[in-house]
Amino acid sequence: MRVRIALLGLSGVGKSTLIGRLRQSVQIVHLQASALIKAEQAYRAQDADSSEALRIGAVMDNQDLIIAAYRREAQATALPIIFDGHNVIDGRDGLVEIPAYVFRALDLDAICYLSADPEWIAERRQMDASRARPVRDAVTLAEHQRIAYSAAERIAEEIGCRFVVIADDKVDQLIELVG
């Protein structure tokens, strides 16, 4: 049986870093939401948007692109899949919660929520010049993390999959889930 896990968390919390560590121990397919959107835009012969344009653009339209690209990638592999994405987007007009139907369409076994100290997240975001992200202080990030955590837990319950909190970059929790 193929394992499908969504690893969610704020931008800059370390999702891709944690998945990189997981890949040192377990063979998986790592599907990033932004890469899936760009791949689907290319597949449909649309101009690919920058990561910043994806964040502030038509967030809900992008979810359909994610679902289509994810399903195509999932059909092509028997390996465990880790979906690296967000359930709450810090968009142009504030926080946008991604509806449960998007995660249901990914046929997930578990939703993992990666949390970290908001001060640390703020520092990571400032040091990462490769991505355009909104500048947020630790207090704001703490509130965003609380909202995203609650939404992830609610989505997992709504779609009937396991909810796992991963704190402090604990790769062993993911290894256990991937099995």
Regions picked out by a protein language model, each given a short descriptive name:
Residues 127-173:
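Small-molecule kinase domains that catalyze NTP-dependent phosphoryl transfer to phosphate-bearing small molecules
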Residues 7:
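Hydrophobic anchor at the beta1->P-loop junction of P-loop NTPases
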